[in-house]
């Protein structure tokens, strides 16, 4: 007599080698329950674990801002909240932290982390988070009865690692998904829709202007050709006045690859990757109108600071840095700032090794004058 066969054993999914195709196989550190050691392995290799965020230039930011107990601080671009958490620790007891962000997906998570941090430090009422673009900071301070200004203001203009590593957000070429790149998915048009309506010259212009991209002409030509192919393959959409299918992240990747077609050297491969980063960054800046928001923030910044207040801004793009440098210099000459950074502050080699995303970060700071020049409000 033989035993009846049991149910067939369920085979576990095979890992696809050193170059897996599926996101969850390649970025196993996102699943700490199944792969508890992966996060530490990634950190030890000098990379940032997917789905997490390591704040950049923390020591340098704290040195520039010098937050002290009892002060009012503003994190104008909260993100994950790494910088805000360190600032909060230094303004307590008696301090107050106001934190802003436009991302409706990440803001509640960061708010919960900060609230817990404040409670652990003994003052659960010390933090307030607000869904607001930093361009409206001056108005927000009035609403919060802080018209006299804040003692400390930080703005970190980089995209957070959580946004980059979330496949559904369309921020990264790592995932073949509809091209979105909106900080606030409920506002404006996704990038894949906006680019479909742009002319080749318009695409080339913003890639040069917002991305400093040397291969802008070739990338723009390839993207425009993709747009034309979409129109040609979707006659019913056009006849019925329906929206065309959105461009995907893979369309942008393919456009960059076409711009480098025929170049196979190691240098060309590294240059292609840099172009890919700059192209996605330029599209993100365009879609979110980031430079206009930055200009508005810089214009109001001196009037958001209390006398002697300190501001620090982290940039990740030369166009952003030029604007900050110019605004700080103009404010110094107008007597609005008492001091500004003489040189840009960069991440140390040690930090760049541990956190590659810090490599492009630039920090500039300014100190508000004790009083406004006559006639300036």
Roles of regions detected by a PLM:
Residues 1-377:
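S-adenosyl-L-methionine-dependent methyltransferase catalytic core, i.e., the SAM/SAH-binding region
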């Amino acid at each position: 007599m033989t035993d009846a066969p049991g149910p067939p054993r369920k085979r576990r999914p095979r890992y696809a080698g050193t170059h897996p195709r599926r996101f969850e196989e390649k970025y196993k550190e996102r699943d700490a329950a199944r792969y508890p050691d992966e996060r530490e392995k990634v950190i030890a290799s000098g990379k940032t674990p997917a789905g997490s965020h390591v704040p950049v230039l923390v020591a340098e930011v704290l040195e520039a801002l010098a937050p002290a107990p009892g002060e009012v601080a503003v994190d104008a671009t909260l993100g994950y909240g790494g910088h805000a958490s360190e600032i909060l620790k230094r303004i307590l007891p008696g301090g107050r932290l106001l934190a802003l962000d436009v991302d409706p997906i990440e803001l509640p998570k960061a708010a919960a982390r900060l609230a817990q941090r404040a409670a652990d430090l003994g003052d659960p009422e010390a933090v307030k988070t607000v869904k607001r673009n930093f361009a409206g900071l001056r108005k927000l301070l009035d609403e919060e009865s802080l018209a006299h200004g804040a003692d400390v203001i930080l703005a970190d203009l980089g995209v957070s690692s959580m946004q980059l590593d979330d496949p559904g957000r369309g921020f990264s070429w790592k995932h073949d998904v509809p091209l979105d790149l909106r900080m606030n998915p409920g506002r404006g048009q996704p990038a894949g829709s906006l680019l479909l309506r742009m002319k080749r010259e318009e695409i080339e212009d913003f890639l040069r202007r917002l991305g400093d991209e040397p291969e802008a002409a070739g990338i723009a030509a390839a993207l425009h050709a993709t747009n034309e192919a979409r129109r040609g393959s979707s006659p019913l959409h056009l006849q019925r006045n329906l929206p065309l299918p959105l461009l995907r992240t893979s369309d942008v990747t393919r456009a960059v690859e076409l711009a480098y077609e025929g170049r196979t050297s190691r240098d060309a491969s590294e240059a292609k990757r840099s172009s890919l980063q700059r192209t996605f960054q330029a599209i993100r800046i365009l879609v979110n109108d980031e430079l206009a928001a930055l200009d508005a923030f810089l214009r109001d910044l001196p009037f958001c600071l209390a006398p002697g207040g300190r501001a620090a801004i982290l940039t990740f793009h030369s166009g952003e840095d030029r604007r900050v440098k110019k605004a700080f210099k103009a404010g110094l000459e107008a007597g609005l700032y008492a001091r500004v950074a003489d040189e840009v502050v960069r991440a140390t080699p040690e930090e760049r090794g541990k956190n590659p995303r810090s490599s492009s970060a630039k920090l500039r700071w300014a100190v508000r004058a004790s009083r406004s020049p006559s006639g300036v409000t």
